[in-house]
Structure formats: structure tokens, C-alpha cells
Amino acid sequence: MRVLGIESSCDETGVAVYDTDLAGSAALRAHAVYSQIALHAEYGGVVPELASRDHVRKLLPLVRQTLAEAGLGVGDIDGVAYTAGPGLVGALLVGAGVARSLAWALEVPAVGVHHMEGHLLAPLMEDDPPQAPFVALLVSGGHTQLVAVDAIGQYRLLGETLDDAAGEAFDKTAKMMGLPYPGGPQLARLAEQGTPGVYRFARPMIDRPGLDFSFSGLKTQVLMAWRDSDQSEQTRADIARGFEDAVVETLSIKCERALEAAGTNVIVVAGGVGANKRLRARLQQMAERLGGRACFPRPALCTDNGAMIAFAGALRLQAGQHSPPKVDVTPRWDMATLPAV
């Protein structure tokens, strides 16, 4: 089954073709992402109306490009998957409208996919994928969650952020220190030049019971350190390193506790922050110490993309799950309400 996947929940337009007749990573026939970073840079954040308009301009050309790279014609598609939520309502409607129109014209089934389920399942596209049960750390600009995965479509929320998501904290901290948009990746690169231990910030909520997170206090602590410093380039790098170390250690500690609570030793990491090199190394070490595995998607599939939507949609389409023939999106959507596959 060849499934066309469309992602348009925020500021990236993603399209992919996933072929269930192929094995492992080869099943991803083609994928392409158009980023709107340059469009939103002057505003310091995503402008929803501009995001929607840019999806309108870019989506169909990206569909044509992806099909060409896969060596397929539009008539070779057996199903269409699209992000139905959560996300920006206007951006979601663009992707849903194109997807439903293609499915109707081709007379093939379509299914709306939960954006975070797409992220959660992205590591399963790689060779030697993990098998449920496992714990997933979903860590991005909009979400920081620990989820127990009992089976595909059977999810239990173990903990989540009470304020800023980890990726949001990266972005806001970078902005406070004058780094260009988008700040998170810039801050991570800057941290490579920092000296560990020069600045040591709190590891939020690790001394409390439960698996929830909080990063707003850490962000304030970094702001105060930056304001009181000489604000030199080396100091900026040292503060960035101290901040990154605090976030990575906090996430690692909570992940280990989540594994114990769920009774497994397999951790799956997905979302934009999942591309962070230091986080990957730390969780890999933790999993090996526990005799388990840490599984990640390739870095290109950590950020928003159509591949994860095509894959998650293929699983549901193969299970006979289709969405009603109407353009409908869910900007706020609890993943625990999803049906099992």
C-alpha cells in the first residue's frame, strides 16, 4: 500500500510517500519538507495567517516533487494521510483540504493523523524498530510528554510539562540571549563551545514525586545569570552549555523513572529536541546501563515532516480505519482518545 502523507500543522510543509510493501527504512520512498523559518524570522515566531498562506502556495508543488522523487504518478497512490491535529487551525485546514480533495479525486481512503502520534511512531520507520511496550519521550517546541505505549494506539500519559515545553524553553532562552530565530538549534550549537560546569542551573522538579516537568523557572534563572554577566561570547556559550546540561539531565532522570514505572527498559525519543546530540548520548547511556534500548528517528525526521504522517496513516489505513469524507480538523486533541490499531 502506497500512502501519501501530508503535514501542515505549523510552519513546515511536509509531504512523503510510504510503501508498506517494502521493508525497514526503504519503505519511505520519498519525503520533502519546506520550512517557513525565513518567512517568520522577522517576527521572532510563527504568524498563523502567514503560515496558512504559505502552505497554500507550497503544498501542491511539494506533492508533485515528492511523487516524482518516488518515481510514482498520482494514480499510484492507494491512500492519503494528513495531520488533523493538534496544531494551528488554518494550517491544518490547508493540509486536510488538499488531502481530502486528492483522496476524493483518486477514489482512495483518507485518514486524519494525530500529529504527536506521528512523532511517537517515527522511530518505528527505522531498521530494527522497537516493539511495544515502551516509553516514549515526546519533546518538541509545543510538547514535552512521557507516554507509556502498550500497543499502537494504546497510550497512557505518565507526565507532561506544567508550563513551557523543553523546545519552547530552548527557543525563549536563546531569544533572551540575543540569538537569531529559531533560537533552539542556535543555542544547542553555541553550547558546544561552552565550558561545562561554569554555570550550573537547577534541575527542575527532580526532587518531587511524579513525572511532570517545569522549565519556566529554569528559563528565569538563565535570564538572571545572563543579565548579571559580562555578556561576552564565551559567557554566552557557557550559559548555553549550563542550560542545555540542565534540560538534558532533567529529561534523562524523568525518563529513567518513567521506564521503572512502566516496567520496560526501552525508551523511544521523538520531536524536534530529539535531534539534540547531547540528549541522544545521555539517553543512550542510560538505556545501556539498564540493559535496554534508546530508539530515535534519523535527525531529519525529528522535526515536523510528512514521513511520520504517511507511516502513522498507513498503519491505520491497513487496520481499516478511515476518516469521514469531510474536511475536519482538531486543533486540540488528546492522544489518549485515539482508537487502537
Curated annotation (Swiss-Prot):
Report the EC code(s) recorded for this entry: 2.3.1.234
| Binding positions (Fe cation) | H115, H119, D304
- Where does this chain mainly localize? cytoplasm
Q: Where is the signal peptide?
A: none
Q: Which GO terms describe its cellular component?
A: cytoplasm
Q: Which SUPFAM superfamilies match?
A: Actin-like ATPase domain
Q: Which cofactor does it need?
A: Fe(2+)
Keyword field: Acyltransferase, Cytoplasm, Iron, Metal-binding, Transferase, tRNA processing
- Reactions the enzyme catalyzes: L-threonylcarbamoyladenylate + adenosine(37) in tRNA = N(6)-L-threonylcarbamoyladenosine(37) in tRNA + AMP + H(+)
* Superkingdom of origin: Bacteria
Gene Ontology biological process: tRNA threonylcarbamoyladenosine modification
- What are the binding positions for substrate in this chain? L138, V139, S140, G141, G142, D171, G184, N276
Q: Name one Pfam family in it.
A: TsaD
Q: Does the keyword Cytoplasm apply?
A: yes
One molecular function GO term is:
iron ion binding
**What are the subcellular locations of this protein?**
Cytoplasm
* Cofactor: record remark: Binds 1 Fe(2+) ion per subunit.
Q: Which NCBIfam families does this one have?
A: gcp_kae1, T6A_TsaD_YgjD
Q: Which family does it belong to?
A: Belongs to the KAE1 / TsaD family.
Q: What does this protein do?
A: Required for the formation of a threonylcarbamoyl group on adenosine at position 37 (t(6)A37) in tRNAs that read codons beginning with adenine. Is involved in the transfer of the threonylcarbamoyl moiety of threonylcarbamoyl-AMP (TC-AMP) to the N6 group of A37, together with TsaE and TsaB. TsaD likely plays a direct catalytic role in this reaction.
Name by which UniProt lists this protein: tRNA N6-adenosine threonylcarbamoyltransferase
Specify the taxonomic lineage.
Bacteria, Pseudomonadati, Pseudomonadota, Gammaproteobacteria, Lysobacterales
